[in-house]
Amino acid sequence: MTSRTKKLKMDEEEILKKEDGSETTSEEEKEEVEEEEEEDKKRKLVKKTPAKKAPAKKAAAKKKSKDEDEDEEEKEEEEETNKTTASVSIAIDNLDEPKVEENQMKIISWNVAGFKSVLSKGFTEYVEKENPDVLCLQETKINPSNIKKDQMPKGYEYHFIEADQKGHHGTGVLTKKKPNAITFGIGIAKHDNEGRVITLEYDQFYIVNTYIPNAGTRGLQRLDYRIKEWDVDFQAYLEKLNATKPIIWCGDLNVAHTEIDLKNPKTNKKSAGFTIEERTSFSNFLEKGYVDSYRHFNPGKEGSYTFWSYLGGGRSKNVGWRLDYFVVSKRLMDSIKISPFHRTSVMGSDHCPIGVVVDLN
């Protein structure tokens, strides 16, 4: 979630200043101001000399392409995540709740921020304890041929799809209940080359596992693509499925729909994931006959997040965003008797797993 990392850090600092309703300056900040004033005095005593311009060739050599910037930022984030995220925890959350009956299906969705990394942090043990019927993974960043069967939880079939660009995006599914069919992508090459969608067909419904494009890792450079191309084509794909049978659309949808879906909405109006364009697009889709299932059961609940920046202890302070969802066809809501849940104590990624239990009758 690279586009929000620096922004969330600034939000955290602002929140910490205002938690008690005051605007007082910390001793550390006072010291920094004093140091800056001292430096200003020193600079005035130094004779100013014009800065030398770098040779054109040297400047050009330093210039990086947009793709190189994104690659470098994603690599830095993954390295930092590996350092700062703990091993997958299974001791705090009661993974036996909610209870799942024979005629029900338990579905878990989790942005793992790198499957290779989470495998080394206790992923298999978590899955064995959680015991989902279907596990949908996003941001797997792995070549399926590099996954070894003996690393995977027993009793599951698994299917992964990678992006054309190595080490980016990607999705995967693990299933105990074998689907009737599996589809990779949505049938449009310009979208499918990023490995963002896997669809499972069951008798009662489709499960659509998705890692929605981020509107921009540096600024909002992909916002137009996200709204005018991806959302248009992907939502048409969902509508086509829904005409046949209900859908369960899950994954990292990269949007905080309303102001209670992130800690600090006022300073994030122009941040990827909370722009009016992204939120409006999501609202318009829901109005066509779909339900944000978590909000259905928890309409006014604040502080329910699924993503936290690893910078500045965002998770421990609960400075986060709700970016992960189970969106379902309205006609399927009678099959969901209890609220979807967030496994906020399960570590290993900057996202937590989310889950839902669906009746199969």
From Swiss-Prot:
Obligatory cofactor(s): Mg(2+); Mn(2+)
Q: Where is this site: Interaction with DNA substrate?
A: 351
Gene Ontology BP, a term:
base-excision repair
Ranges for the region named Disordered are: 1-90
Q: Which UniProt keywords apply?
A: DNA damage, DNA repair, Hydrolase, Magnesium, Metal-binding, Nucleus
Which note does the record give on the cofactor?
A: Probably binds two magnesium or manganese ions per subunit.
InterPro entries (UniProt xref): AP_endonuc_1, AP_endonuclease_F1_BS, AP_endonuclease_F1_CS, Endo/exonu/phosph_ase_sf, Endo/exonuclease/phosphatase
Q: Which residues bind Mg(2+) 2?
A: 252, 254
Homology family: Belongs to the DNA repair enzymes AP/ExoA family.
State the protein's name.
Answer: DNA-(apurinic or apyrimidinic site) endonuclease
Question: What is the source species?
Answer: Dictyostelium discoideum
